[in-house]
Amino acid sequence: MKRNNKQTMAIVIILGVFLLTGCSDELPEDELVNNGQAFEMHKITDDLQAGNFPFQNDNGFVTLTQLKDSVKELLGDKYWPEVDLTKEELEQKTGITEDMYVDFLAEKQVLDAHIDTMIIIHAKEAHVGEVEQALEKYRADIIEQNKNYPQNLCKAEASRMETIEDYVCFVQLGADTTIVADKGEDAMIAYCQEENERALYVLEKEILE
């Protein structure tokens, strides 16, 4: 009698194991999908927290600060902007409001009399055109304000605005133009244009590749 009880108990245990295994292997498909989606959402959230409004190129996530650092690395001591603009200062100077962009980076020199500037606006898709117009007007205003200052005027006239995907970039660089000042205004403009082209080359490469 005891042996029969043991055999019965063993059969019950074995059946229980098979039932549990079957339930585990046969989870409803929608539950499996939901579990997978929850994992993916958690992973995406972790990625977004790793950087400040990053965008993704083929090499991974890149922030606007990393874009700036790439330009600084190429230009070296010829990159003079050093003070970040706040969103309020950006709006005051350019008319670009917070609702037009995802993120921005804007740097200028400490003294307003010195005009080396770089602005990168990650524009919202619906506002790319407005941001472009605002920066074109900003550029025209700087040219007008510096008509009586030859070296600054050359930098302003050499400035460039270029749109790369949803990134609207404004570069007004050149650093020390006195090294070509004795060759005339055309030489100073050409010198600054070359520095701006170098900066835009880096930005385009980082954003698109």
Summary of predicted features, one role per range:
Residues I11-G16:
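Hydrophobic helical h-region of N-terminal Sec-dependent signal peptides
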Residues S24-T117, A123-E209:
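Soluble, non-membrane globular domain cores that form compact, hydrophobic packing
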Residues K2-N5, V17, A106-E107, K155-A156:
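A generic local structural motif
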Residues L19-G22:
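C-terminal motif of bacterial Sec signal peptides marking the signal peptidase cleavage site
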Residues K2-A10, I121:
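Bacterial N-terminal signal peptides that target proteins for export
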